[in-house]
Amino acid sequence: MSNSLDRLERKLGYTFKDRDLMVLALTHRSYAGRNNERLEFLGDAILNFVIGEALFHHFPQAREGQLSRLRARLVKGETLALLARGFEVGDYLRLGSGELKSGGFRRESILADAMEALIGAIYLDTGMDSARERIIAWLGPQLRELTPVDTNKDPKTRLQEFLQSRGCDLPRYEVVDIQGEPHCRTFFVDCEVALLSDKTHGHGGSRRIAEQVAAAAALVALGVENGHD
């Protein structure tokens, strides 16, 4: 196991002083004993801060909503899982037998969670400077490729990317009413998001427009956007 972890450390570009932290970061909740969920929680907070700080300095003219959307792109599960696959993190995960048999070492959510846990472990091992250095090294190429133009997406796409970055279910849209004559209808849509206790609402001349309005309202309710971006 020790030699195996040596290889992973070389891929990560970081050598742990406390190897137990590394092992814990690679331990899924399906495995007996302690698991990486607390480290994942810590790593998620550190990742969001470091990327937010980097974007703040990298895009001095970008608005708050733009910065939030750019950050969501960088910290979403898909991006983290891609990193994990590049480092072959799945080969080093400790999984319960059921999760192992079902291919958990390939699952996007498990890989993304492990990357966040590793960030948390690095922070506890040698501090914030080390965690920041590794995050920027890992995500630097994606960061340099971003432009504020990348935020010019419709509200439904922005909401979906934000929720995916938090590991949440996708929003659900429901047409609750249609008013007016066939040639001049108004659609009323509810948007249900797991992170919100109340549904948001939108209306417009088509179902698509109504869904976009409801999604925009959800982004404001979540505090991701202020309604003026």
From Swiss-Prot:
GO terms for molecular function: double-stranded RNA binding; metal ion binding; ribonuclease III activity; rRNA binding. The lineage of its organism: Bacteria, Pseudomonadati, Pseudomonadota, Gammaproteobacteria, Pseudomonadales. This is Ribonuclease 3. It is an enzyme of class 3 (hydrolase). Digests double-stranded RNA. Involved in the processing of primary rRNA transcript to yield the immediate precursors to the large and small rRNAs (23S and 16S). Processes some mRNAs, and tRNAs when they are encoded in the rRNA operon. Processes pre-crRNA and tracrRNA of type II CRISPR loci if present in the organism. Its cofactor is Mg(2+). GO terms for biological process: mRNA processing; regulation of gene expression; RNA processing; rRNA processing; tRNA processing. Belongs to the ribonuclease III family. It is found in: Cytoplasm. Keywords: Cytoplasm, Endonuclease, Hydrolase, Magnesium, Metal-binding, mRNA processing, Nuclease, RNA-binding, rRNA processing, rRNA-binding, tRNA processing. The active site is at residues 44, 116. One of its GO terms (cellular component) is cytosol. Residues 5-127 form the RNase III domain. Mg(2+) binds at residues 40, 113, 116. Homodimer. HAMAP family: RNase_III (MF_00104). It holds the Pfam family dsrm. Residues 154-224 form the DRBM domain. Its EC number is 3.1.26.3.
